[in-house]
């Protein structure tokens, strides 16, 4: 799990060491992880709901249950769950967790990018994405968009 973080930091250090003329800085560690257990992929990026509350953030969470392929009758379809944590005041994403099939890796990495770029729930609800029946949820039921909409409805 530390290799992902170390690799990102090493790219920055290497670029700075060799004076590559691009601004590179570490804006902090997101804490982004994924694992595979008996056919289910789990991922987490940023703060969990429990940690955010413990740290004193006023938050709103968006949660969505779905499937990782469309239609759900395709062979190998796995149930999915996505939870996104947002600041209640600003709507900026603070964290997210996912549970699903192999497509979970791309979803948790998108959440990590959203955290790093300080995206708001309104930006996530208008996210444009590529979908394919065997690779992703349906474009009408994309979990990041639906979780952002769920959070928005609670603000």
Predicted regions and their residues:
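Flexible, glycine-rich terminal cap/loop adjacent to redox cofactors
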Residues: 38-41, 45, 55-155
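A conserved FAD-binding loop/helix module that cradles the flavin
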Residues: 1-47, 135-155
């Amino acid at each position: 799990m530390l290799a992902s973080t170390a690799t990102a930091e090493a790219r920055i250090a290497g670029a700075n060491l060799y004076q590559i003329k691009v601004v590179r800085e570490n804006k902090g560690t997101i804490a982004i992880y994924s694992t595979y257990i008996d056919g289910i992929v789990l991922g987490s990026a940023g703060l969990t709901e429990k940690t955010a509350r413990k740290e004193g953030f006023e938050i709103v969470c968006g949660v969505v249950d779905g499937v990782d392929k469309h239609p759900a009758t395709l062979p190998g379809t796995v149930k999915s769950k996505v939870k996104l944590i947002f600041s209640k005041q600003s709507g900026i994403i603070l964290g997210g967790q996912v549970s699903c099939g192999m497509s979970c890796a791309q979803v948790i990495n998108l959440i990590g990018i959203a955290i790093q770029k300080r995206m708001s729930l309104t930006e996530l609800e208008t996210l444009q994405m590529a979908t394919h029946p065997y690779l992703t949820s349906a474009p009408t039921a994309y979990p990041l968009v639906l979780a952002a909409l769920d959070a928005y409805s609670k603000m």
